[in-house]
């Protein structure tokens, strides 16, 4: 049984490390020319571009992002009394395609105090939940602003619920034309969604 377990571990490890059989990837990962530790010192733009049709090497982006978050957090604490001198903003477009960044639910809650912020850009919230499972709710709770550019289904429902409800004044008039004409007026306060799911679905993006 022990032999089978060891063999299973080796097979699993071999599958995970298989991309490093590619010489170009080994060369790319063998030395550092990005100087990630300088990003919080001066204004710098770093673009990470990945294929939108082949996710073979997306894990490299996830590793880099994880290393960058942790490196800058340590740098802020060790060198700048907990806050970087230059704000670092992460624009994480196609965030779901990057792959899972380890401990991202913890990082997103702590980077703000260190003069860092992250914009998470998704096609739908379900993408986030598919990758981060229960931690997706924590990540969403730590996003203080939501920019919605249109959509249907559950996305529109979630946005409608998050917007909440409003109170409206309702007036109903009635008229009775019997032997004597009489008029009635009924007033009540009603609650309704600030924007319904249908209204959100057809709004201009």
Region locations from a protein language model:
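P-loop NTPase motor core of the ASCE superfamily
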Residues: 43-46, 106-109, 127-205
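Preference for short coil/turn "hinge" residues that link or interrupt alpha-helices
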Residues: 29-32, 91, 121, 152, ...
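Acidic, glycine-rich active-site loops and adjacent beta-strand->loop/helix elements
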Residues: 96, 124-126
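Conserved residues at beta->alpha junctions
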Residues: 51, 122, 150
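Structural recognition of the conserved hydrophobic beta-strand(s) that form the central parallel beta-sheet
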Residues: 117-123
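P-loop NTPase motor domains
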Residues: 1-116, 131, 141, 201-204
């Amino acid at each position: 049984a022990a032999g089978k377990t060891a063999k299973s571990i080796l097979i699993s490890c071999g599958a995970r490390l298989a991309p490093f059989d590619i010489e170009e990837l080994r060369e790319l990962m063998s030395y550092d020319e990005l100087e990630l530790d300088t990003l919080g010192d001066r204004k710098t733009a770093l673009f990470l571009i990945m294929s939108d049709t082949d996710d073979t090497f997306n894990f490299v982006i996830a590793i880099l992002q994880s290393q960058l978050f942790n490196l800058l957090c340590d740098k802020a604490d060790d060198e700048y009394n907990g806050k970087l001198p230059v704000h670092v903003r992460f624009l994480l477009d196609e965030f779901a395609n990057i792959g899972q960044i380890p401990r991202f639910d913890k990082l997103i809650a702590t980077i703000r105090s260190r003069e860092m912020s992250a914009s998470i850009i998704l096609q739908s919230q379900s993408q986030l939940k598919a990758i981060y499972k229960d931690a997706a709710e924590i990540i969403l709770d730590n996003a203080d602003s939501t920019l919605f550019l249109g959509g249907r289904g559950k996305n529109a429902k979630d946005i409608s619920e998050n917007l909440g409800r409003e109170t409206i004044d309702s007036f109903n008039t009635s008229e009775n034309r019997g032997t004597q004409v009489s008029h009635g007026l009924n007033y009540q306060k009603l609650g309704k969604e600030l924007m319904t799911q249908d209204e959100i679905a057809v709004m201009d993006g």
